[in-house]
From Swiss-Prot:
Pfam families: RrnaAD
Highest taxon, organism lineage: Bacteria
Family under the similarity heading: Belongs to the class I-like SAM-binding methyltransferase superfamily. rRNA adenine N(6)-methyltransferase family. RsmA subfamily.
Reactions catalysed: adenosine(1518)/adenosine(1519) in 16S rRNA + 4 S-adenosyl-L-methionine = N(6)-dimethyladenosine(1518)/N(6)-dimethyladenosine(1519) in 16S rRNA + 4 S-adenosyl-L-homocysteine + 4 H(+)
Name of the featured protein: Ribosomal RNA small subunit methyltransferase A
Described function: Specifically dimethylates two adjacent adenosines (A1518 and A1519) in the loop of a conserved hairpin near the 3'-end of 16S rRNA in the 30S particle. May play a critical role in biogenesis of 30S subunits.
Organism of origin: Sinorhizobium medicae (strain WSM419) (Ensifer medicae)
InterPro entries xrefs: KsgA/Erm, rRNA_Ade_diMease-like_C, rRNA_Ade_Mease_Trfase_CS, rRNA_Ade_methylase_Trfase_N, rRNA_adenine_dimethylase, SAM-dependent_MTases_sf
GO molecular function: 16S rRNA (adenine(1518)-N(6)/adenine(1519)-N(6))-dimethyltransferase activity; RNA binding
Places the protein is found: Cytoplasm
SMART domains membership: rADc (SM00650)
Length: 274
């Protein structure tokens, strides 16, 4: 990558700007520039596309996205220490990098959209799941994004793509399965990062289902939270606060079943009966 874009190696950038990763911000910087290119390529063709990136840090993934031809990258970065390093990338790619300093959980992402949008990010571990849920549950659908290519801890990635009767199946699997086609792209070993996390990471690619099963996002979330909050109990017990056996009878679902056995369609049916 250094030869490809003419910018210095990431280790040099991190050392020059004193960018030790902060655990409190969920930071793990990805140093392998071959891997950052692989992540960017997983998102598909980037020419003419605006890419939203969360937590760019020193900019390894940002560089890959720009080198592969994205029209623009809008990078959300909370850590002000990273801004000078990102400014150097912006100078190398004039008018193609906008950096927004702030908390990604408080950003209006739809307002940042400029034409076709893909979200590509090595998400901070401490906010990654909440950001994904926020992107999945807007009232308007199809969403503002064409696809999401995101890195998570492998455990979270398995939950995203899980299906019924899978040990990893839960609220996240239902929400992702309802509105997206999600797939695991590839794993990333701990030694690719600084500092190395204790777990393997994985890249997940999600594309929106244009017309998902009609259902209220808020009600579906309420049903899945109740059902998986006591996942080992029968549904008649775990869904008691929402109507229990009466709700299940209305939806035509056996009250002796457990949450992990229900399909996305059955969860939507329950939500629509509330």
């Amino acid at each position: 990558m250094a030869a490809l874009d003419g910018l210095p190696p990431l280790r040099d950038v991190i050392q020059r700007h004193g960018l030790d990763a902060k655990k409190a911000l969920g930071q793990n910087f990805l140093l392998d520039l071959n891997l950052t290119q692989k992540i960017a390529r997983t998102a598909g063709p980037l020419e003419g596309v605006t890419v939203i990136e969360v937590g760019p840090g020193p900019g390894g993934l940002t560089r890959a996205i720009l080198a592969l031809g994205a029209k623009k990258v809008v990078a959300i970065e909370r850590d002000s220490r990273c801004l000078p390093a990102l400014a150097e990338i912006g100078a190398h790619y004039p008018e193609r990098l906008d950096v927004v300093e702030g908390d990604a959980l408080k950003v209006d992402f739809e307002a940042l959209a400029d034409g076709p949008v893909r979200i590509i990010a090595n998400l901070p571990y401490n906010v990654g799941t909440q950001l994904l849920v926020n992107w999945l549950l807007p009232g308007r659908w199809p969403p503002f994004w064409q696809s999401m290519t995101l890195m998570f801890q492998r455990e979270v990635g398995l939950r995203i793509v899980a299906s019924p009767d899978d040990d990893h199946y839960g609220r996240l699997g239902v929400l992702c399965g309802w509105r997206t086609k999600a797939s695991l792209a590839f794993d990333v070993p701990p030694q690719a990062f600084t500092p190395p996390p204790k777990v393997t990471s994985t890249v997940v690619h999600l594309e929106p289902i244009e017309v998902p099963i009609p259902c209220s996002p808020a009600v579906l979330e309420k049903v899945t939270q109740a059902a998986f909050g006591q996942r080992r109990k029968m549904l008649r017990q775990s869904l008691k606060p929402l109507g229990g056996e009466a709700l299940l009878a209305k939806a035509g679902i056996d009250p002796k079943r457990r949450a992990e056995t229900l399909s996305v369609e059955e969860f939507c049916r329950l939500a629509n009966c509330l």
